[in-house]
Amino acid sequence: MTSSVSNTQLNLRIISIVVFTCICYLSIGLPLAVLPGYIHYQLGYSTLIAGVVISLQYISTLFSRPHAGRYTDIWGPKKVVSLGIVCCLLSGLFTLGAVALQSVPLLAISALLIGRIFLGVGESFTATGATLWGIKTVGAIQGSAWKTEIIPR
């Protein structure tokens, strides 16, 4: 088998991992364009509250990242990525719920807060799991090649 064929096969193996990572980061980036304005103008909360709601995702990412690594070691990266995508989906459902509850701003902001927590956990699980899934997929094949480039014999 030639080197170019094996590189093509490795690239094809990694595509699904890249797709899951893309879905995760789209679910993170797209709401950033509209959520602060929605919280401030539609729900009537201050810009400080809007900032707290946005920041809650990153705080939950910070606290859930070690758990994501531990669960990846226990369950394997595919299951952790799947769980992360489910958390991102739940975040979207809570965000849609906030729109449905717009007439009751306290319930709407509560739904957004819960959704942002799910999104932070989803980011941790998807990013950690996808990174380790990629290493597991190509690491055994490419690991020795990388080692010889980094550590000369």
Give residue spans per PLM region.
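Residue-level signature of mid-helix packing/kink "hotspots" within the transmembrane helices
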Residues: 58-66
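Small-residue hotspots at the loop-to-helix junctions and early N-terminal turns
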Residues: 47-51
